[in-house]
């Protein structure tokens, strides 16, 4: 997977988890590795900081929590993913079956 695409997925995962609970670098790294991402602590920290700069997360010492802006962004992403998944995850129609 291209790095830019992977980073988008990682950001979405982070917003999802932040919507559920506070995040730490080590917890998030373990979660992401559980999904098959090969990420180091530095990459996780950079993505958390990027989401913080975009006002999607706020830092509280070593923990990060989602902001109102982050919640709204997550809702918008969720809606787009529902549409995308309904299209991408259904078997493609062949030209003959149309």
Per-segment meaning from a language model:
Residues 38-53:
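Short amphipathic alpha-helical interaction segments
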Residues 63-77:
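Basic, amphipathic "hinge/linker" alpha-helix immediately C-terminal to the N-terminal HTH DNA-binding motif
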Residues 1-21:
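Short alpha-helical segments that sit at the start of domains
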Residues 78-98:
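Amphipathic alpha-helical dimerization/coiled-coil segments
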Residues 52-62:
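A short, conserved structural fragment
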Residues 16-17, 35, 54:
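Alpha-helix C-capping/helix-to-loop hinge sites
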Residues 22-32:
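Short acidic, hydrophobic short linear motifs in intrinsically disordered regions
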